Amino acid sequence: MTKVGFETKNWVYTGSNLAPDKEKIEKMRKDFADKNQDTFSFIAIDKKNKKIVGSMMSSFKKNGRLRHRIGMGWGIHPDYQGKGIGTKLLKESLRYAKKKGFKRAEAEMAIENKGSWKLALKNGFKIEGEKKKALLTDDGRYVDTYLVGRML
């Protein structure tokens, strides 16, 4: 069996421990579109080996009372964490969202994923709440999450 993407225990949005590759991102886009949502994504690629080393996806409602905000999710390959890739992806995503007229950005991440919530806080997000046992991991553990948000 061939794995796609890359291993990261804290990835939330794929339903597995694999951060998405290009095909998974396209499938996620289609799934969002089927639910009256749309997405935009930014991907970091290592120039030397041409592999995806990080991704940032934002989803949004096309109409209704939630149309002013985006929900964000990201994953950075463990070998590339701490090198500013997440910061660059997040800043570019926020810049693009603001340019498109969105007013608010939100994300949810495992509390044990310190790198993720530190990235969010460093970029102006505030912790707005906690959810107990919000995620069920592939190995059967329940994980608490932070809800973070910021205005653009």
Regions found by a protein language model. Give the residues of each.
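Acetyl-CoA-dependent GNAT
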Residues: 18-79, 151-152
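Conserved G/P- and acidic residue-centered "switch" motifs that form tight phosphate/ATP-binding loops
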Residues: 50, 84, 101, 113
